[in-house]
Design a protein with these regions (language model features):
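Recognition helix of helix-turn-helix/homeodomain-like DNA-binding domains
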Residues: 36-72
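Amphipathic alpha-helical repeat scaffolds of TPR domains
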Residues: 143-155, 166-178, 190-231
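Charged, low-complexity interaction regions
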Residues: 157-164, 181-188, 208-209, 238-240
Length: 275
């Protein structure tokens, strides 16, 4: 199972990386991206017909891992185009054993603002699950904040701190909802969510119950949240441009409108006895 999940993670990273690159170059077809990044791989046969090379098609689907040389070439043409492929979130998700020895290394690979939230005054990883820490990471919803929350959830699980694990799981769920439409633009939303169902949400237990997201429509919920956030934004009038982009969505998840929309964005739970 771990091997299959590892392949899924690599596939997702490669596919998303290729999509980022094609967006930057404003090229949709894999062959057009190939023409810009690796023109030397385009050749013709004796009849002057182009030789079909399916590697870039494979990259776009996450089927092949590009070489480091090719990734560096892409990085020179489109800066930060390969950051998704090498993002620490994939390492955090695929690591099967204890992670406490590697946690600091992974934190140091995250955005500096996220590091400032996760690290305490003596450059130690924060303990507990304060609303200050969770809220700061949720407001900055990104691949980096999601990686940080996932790492912290796993650390607390290793320490047997199940109440804190539950709080982090709830926070991860909210960030996934905030990022859902972004993931969907890259065609990886459902795959990303299912990886979290398998690898992260399964860690949580709450008052004799466990998370059951087997029938949860993640993509629909994410777009529904966007629609709600827009309606909330319109109510705020002149204040709207002063807020962080996630402010209005979080009003529906944890703020003023939480109770009104709770049934749409509450984590489904089932009794452990039913498992």
């Amino acid at each position: 199972m771990v091997g299959i999940i590892h392949l899924k993670l690599v596939s997702m990273g490669i596919g998303t990386d290729h999509r980022c690159l094609s967006n930057h170059l404003e090229k949709d077809a894999p062959r057009e991206v190939q023409r810009v990044i690796a023109p030397n791989t385009l050749s013709s046969d004796v009849n002057a017909d182009p030789i079909k090379n399916n590697k870039f098609l494979g990259y776009s689907r996450g089927a092949h891992v590009p070489s480091k040389a090719l990734a560096l070439r892409a990085e020179r043409v489109a800066p930060r185009s390969s950051w998704v492929l090498y993002h620490p979130i994939w390492t955090v998700l695929r690591s099967a054993g204890p992670i406490h020895k590697h946690a600091m290394t992974w934190v140091r690979q995250l955005d500096h603002e996220i590091q400032g939230i996760v690290l305490g005054p003596y450059s130690t990883i924060v303990g507990g699950a304060s609303r200050h820490t969770l809220g700061a990471l949720e407001r900055r919803a990104s691949l980096d904040s999601l990686a940080a929350l996932t790492l912290l959830a796993r650390l607390h699980h290793e320490a047997g701190e199940h109440e804190w694990v539950w709080l982090y799981i709830c926070s991860i769920f909210r960030v996934l909802l905030l990022l859902g439409t972004h993931f969907d633009q890259y065609g990886v939303a459902e795959r990303m969510f299912q990886l979290y169902v398998q690898r992260v949400f399964s860690l949580a237990e709450f008052e004799g119950r466990r998370v059951d997201l087997s029938n949860y429509d993640y993509v629909f919920a994410s777009y529904h949240l966007v629609g709600i956030a827009e309606r909330v934004r319109n109510k705020h009038g002149s204040q709207r441009d002063r807020r962080m982009p996630t402010f209005y969505a979080l009003q529906a998840l944890t703020g003023l409108y939480e109770q009104r929309f709770k049934k749409h964005f509450q984590i489904p739970l089932v009794s452990l006895a039913e498992s």
